């Protein structure tokens, strides 16, 4: 199976997000890469489902709370930017202050 670099990156996000979700369900607090992957995954899947950029910007703020991540992680993540494929093309989705 031949995957482009972009497809490889998306696949890596899916794997990381699944691992993060599993750890969160076990009651573990997430680290930086786990938090980013969960937010990015929700944006990518939301775009695939046909949601708008504005809907995804809001949804990205609802994925995690400060209680879900290790101390200091929420302060480290100011913005999450994901290039997602929508029915009308590829767009950059930016979520400001995604963890509150």
UniProtKB/Swiss-Prot annotation:
GO terms for molecular function: nickel cation binding; urease activity. One of its GO terms (biological process) is urea catabolic process. Pathway: Nitrogen metabolism; urea degradation; CO(2) and NH(3) from urea (urease route): step 1/1. The keyword Hydrolase applies. GO terms for cellular component: cytoplasm. It holds the Pfam family Urease_gamma. It catalyses: urea + 2 H2O + H(+) = hydrogencarbonate + 2 NH4(+). Its main location: cytoplasm. It is an enzyme of class 3 (hydrolase). Its EC number is 3.5.1.5. Gene3D superfamilies: Urease, gamma-like subunit (3.30.280.10). InterPro entries: Urease_gamma, Urease_gamma/gamma-beta_su, Urease_gamma_sf, Urease_subunit. It is found in: Cytoplasm. It comes from the Bacteria. Keywords: Cytoplasm, Hydrolase. Heterotrimer of UreA (gamma), UreB (beta) and UreC (alpha) subunits. Three heterotrimers associate to form the active enzyme. Belongs to the urease gamma subunit family. This is Urease subunit gamma. It comes from Lachnoclostridium phytofermentans (strain ATCC 700394 / DSM 18823 / ISDg).
